[in-house]
């Protein structure tokens, strides 16, 4: 009986860790990671990345770049069967409504399969979107998502203090409201 209780206690204690898996590195040169079975993240892809992407079940690519938005069109064509979506964001102007709109786009396209989200470096705009995705859909705490964005090897640029300031209960509440989750 004591052994069974001990096992239950250990399993209960470890339960939160199972939903907090780290993203899996796919290709370091592209800052390409698998977040979960339906979400990947990267920097702006280059022609050499095409073969790697073709071996992953990605059905849509969401480009968050505001400037120079045509990079994906230079790499992928109609025969690749990958939907290319431009959703430009200015790093210094991201607020809860933009986060919610981006998450809606991701969720909508996940109905067809995995989505890759990227910006120029795959660190800042991509980082805040993946962090909020983790909070909203993986039930991560704000602190866990913030820690992943700031301290993981994605290359977050600390100049973007406005992104760090988005890690609040009020921002998450507003994102949920815009998503129709409250």
Regions found by a protein language model. Name each.
Residues 1-4:
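Positively charged n-region of N-terminal signal peptides that target proteins for export
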Residues 122:
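Substrate/cofactor-recognition hotspot
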Residues 18-115, 128-182:
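Cys-dependent protein tyrosine phosphatase-like superfamily
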């Amino acid at each position: 009986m004591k052994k069974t209780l001990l096992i239950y206690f250990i399993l209960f204690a470890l339960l939160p860790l199972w939903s907090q898996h780290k993203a899996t590195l796919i290709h370091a040169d592209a800052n390409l990671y698998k977040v979960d079975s339906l979400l990947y993240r990267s920097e702006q892809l280059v022609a050499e990345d095409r073969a790697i992407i073709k071996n992953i079940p990605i059905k849509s690519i969401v480009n968050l770049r505001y400037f120079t938005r045509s990079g994906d069109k230079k790499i992928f064509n109609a025969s690749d069967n990958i939907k290319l979506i431009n959703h430009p964001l200015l790093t210094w102007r991201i607020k809860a409504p933009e986060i919610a709109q981006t998450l809606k786009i991701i969720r909508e396209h996940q109905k067809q399969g995995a989505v890759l989200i990227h910006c120029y470096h795959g660190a800042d705009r991509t980082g805040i979107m993946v962090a909020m995705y983790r909070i909203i859909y993986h039930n991560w705490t704000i602190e866990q998502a913030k820690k992943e964005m700031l301290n993981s090897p994605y290359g977050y640029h600390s100049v973007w203090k406005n992104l760090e300031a988005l890690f609040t209960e009020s921002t998450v509440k507003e994102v949920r409201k815009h998503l129709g989750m409250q």
